Amino acid sequence: MMENVFDYEDIQLIPAKCIVNSRSECDTTVTLGKHKFKLPVVPANMQTIIDERIATYLAENNYFYIMHRFQPEKRISFIRDMQSRGLIASISVGVKEDEYEFVQQLAAEHLTPEYITIDIAHGHSNAVINMIQHIKKHLPESFVIAGNVGTPEAVRELENAGADATKVGIGPGKVCITKIKTGFGTGGWQLAALRWCAKAASKPIIADGGIRTHGDVAKSIRFGATMVMIGSLFAGHEESPGETIEKDGKLYKEYFGSASEFQKGEKKNVEGKKMFVEHKGSLEDTLIEMEQDLQSSISYAGGTKLDSIRTVDYVVVKNSIFNGDKVY
């Protein structure tokens, strides 16, 4: 049994002496594989979070992105389209038989996406290990992200199989109900799980799920994440895919989980739900605010770069830091 687990709202980072005159001097960039990105943040590869338009916007502006895999037949034209514009192609694959053929087809057509994310709910499995090896054999130049996992053993095994990064988080997401439906996962202790996994990792880790505030991005970095995947905070923007509805004079957008009946079109093995989030304005504004908040985090950490956050002290506050006033 794990002792002393904690989640984002149980932790406060402790400030160190500031060395900048303005937070604008702080550098939030991060390198993943061969490319450098403006923020250590990636919108979730979910149908109500990202589409081709948003992927293009993110890539053009030096943000990392991962396209979802829910219209698999569009992936080849997507890769061609992105690369023809001089942008990175970053796609998702599953582990079913036709995905093996898809990888071979990419190799045959000499299409190498810069990033491939093997994306299944329970990533600590032979199915994922086999797919990592298959991709590495046919597309050795692609950077492979494998997940999702929640234990150090899983991180080690996927790294040993050839994964270039692992994605950590089982069910902590806002529209994920894995914890309720199965009793398993990292919901409620995602930050501790991240720390536990990061200690075992020799390659980058992507924290996935449970982020509710911008401060949680800094906390993820403190506990070992290179990149932080975010769903709900990116949902509900003008550009976001999904229906807009009006209720009591307020605008909302739908946001649903990746194994929800809304996404699957059926009610079998449902582990996701749908919710309506308040309409948030433009994605660009949110990304700019995230960058500014992270610059402030870096200045509180007493540094000029993201890495300075990794060494700050922290406290575990057993009463939630939000004193009952939920900020999200």
Swiss-Prot record:
Keyword NADP appears in the UniProt entry: yes
UniProt catalytic activity: IMP + NH4(+) + NADP(+) = GMP + NADPH + 2 H(+)
Keywords annotated in UniProt: NADP, Oxidoreductase
Enzyme nomenclature, EC number: 1.7.1.7
Top-level taxon of origin: Bacteria
Binding sites annotated in the UniProt record for NADP(+): 205-228
UniProt GO cellular component terms: cytosol; GMP reductase complex
KW Transmembrane (keyword) present: no
One term of GO molecular function: GMP reductase activity
Family: Belongs to the IMPDH/GMPR family. GuaC type 2 subfamily.
Matching PANTHER family: GMP REDUCTASE (PTHR43170:SF5)
Name of this chain's protein: GMP reductase
Organism field: Bacillus thuringiensis (strain Al Hakam)
